[in-house]
């Protein structure tokens, strides 16, 4: 997919087919049941692209992937926010592992970045990001976040649209999430962005997932009935007769944020986006801003989630 705005993502994330067709096979875990038994644990190791990582290194890589939201390399002042995000990511992995086993296809919301990819993305500042992710992984492994004694899925996004989605509006039974406003997210360097998708690209992605789908001949009538909340976060839409959530649509077609406006001209779909991610749960950018203002990990976690925090020693 072609990058047309300042998004903070690598160009390869917007390749029309290669990067997007892979997303078609990913199940949308966030639409499932979101609470697992208290006894769920995490695996000793995880294999990603034929490389075996210890669980701690895997968790560190998941944290690294989310640090793309930062406007500048992390400092000690950012630690509490990054640690809080790491604990939320760890909780989600524990939940997913408890219900599905650790199949990489079960992690559309828990993305991974290797240290090599970190070096390519962050360049000479990579060590600062790795150090911050290291510290956050250590904090996460000593912290359990739960809701009424159950492990739960705690979604995070890099940058919100400025208003986090109310889970009830999105049809999600997740009472531990809060509807919050994050006005400072609008000042993030990666807040505004955009991408494009050709009608042929849309057709190929849809046919890969729905081989029997009938595509309307008029390209401007293929994406319709877009419904958004008051913050502009897309809750649902219809794609060639298939109703899907905003989250599902963005993952399937590589749109970077559920807060988007779409135009279609001559078979080319253009998406203008605000924020980066699903705009639900915890905004990592907002969490870091809270950290810089003096909030600690517990205060940050408690701001975004109605959940209990337990130290594990």
Predicted segments with their positions:
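Conserved, single-site charged/polar hotspot
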Residues: 1-313
